[in-house]
Amino acid sequence: MTDFKMTQDAQGIATLTWDCIGKSMNVMSFEALQQMNALIDQALADEAVKGIILTSGKKDFAAGMDLNVLADLRNASGENPAEGVFNGIQSIHQIFRKIERAGMDAKTNKGGKPIATVLPGTALGIGFELPLATHRIFAADNPKAKIGLPEILVGLFPGAGGTIRLVRKLGAMVAAPFLLEGKTLPPAKAKAAGLIDSVSADPMADARAWVLNATEADLIKPWDQKGYKMPGGTPYHPSGFMTFIGASAMVHGKTKGAYPAAKALLSAVYEGAQVPFEIALKIEARWFTSVLMNP
């Protein structure tokens, strides 16, 4: 089965359409990830491709990760299931980071291709973590759609880079309700909150126009730019310190210490804020593995 298909038009835009066969909602599997990864490699290597758009063949974008995949990953890892889970999460991080860097030179940040996501409807969990790794997110003006990272509500936390990216995008205080409470928003409010970039009646047309006109500067995430400073400050900055103290108190007050996912999430945020982005992803993977192995 093929969950991802790619088409290319005369203007050089490659469109990757996610459409899980036999399912009403897209859910990510490791097989689908490998399919997507191969198509991304193909598009990045093709000189005729000027940019890439990720979208869905269904009314919604995606519901998240197939939780059975995580269980299978743990069970298939033999005597060291934690290592298997960690390596599996790291492989997702590598694919998403490849999308984020999009062929850019590591030193000059030049030579990349614009990659946008078009959300026709709901995007949750890894179905939002994937768009967060792209350069722009365009959503349909669909008030019934929900956008966010609700993993904490099922005893997990965003482990495919969503925790680290959202905190570096919004700052710890602004990101807290989405990460620690699993808050989701319709597209218009998601845009106002800074989760996505555009809401319109025709997001595909907007995405195509952006891809064709994007500059090299448009592709560089803030955390890959020199002099980046986290909104609200890092834990060792005075304002950031108070943010993290407040978040810690909120977690303890709401969970009474009984829910390891919330504590692990906060640890990933705190530790990840103090190190370069690539190392922060490894920290996120380590804490996610800890939660999965010790629910």
Where are these regions (language model features)?
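A glycine- and small-aliphatic-rich helix-loop capping segment at beta-alpha/alpha-beta transitions
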Residues: 68-76, 129, 134-141, 169
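Glycine-rich beta-to-alpha active-site loop
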Residues: 99-154, 158, 178
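Hydrophobic, secondary-structure "cap" segments at the distal end of domains
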Residues: 162-173
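Conserved CoA-thioester-binding segment of acyl-CoA-metabolizing enzymes
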Residues: 1-55, 79
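Hydrophobic/aromatic residues within transmembrane alpha-helices
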Residues: 54, 66, 130-131, 190
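Glycine- (often His-adjacent) and acidic-residue-rich active-site loop
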Residues: 56-95, 123, 153-155
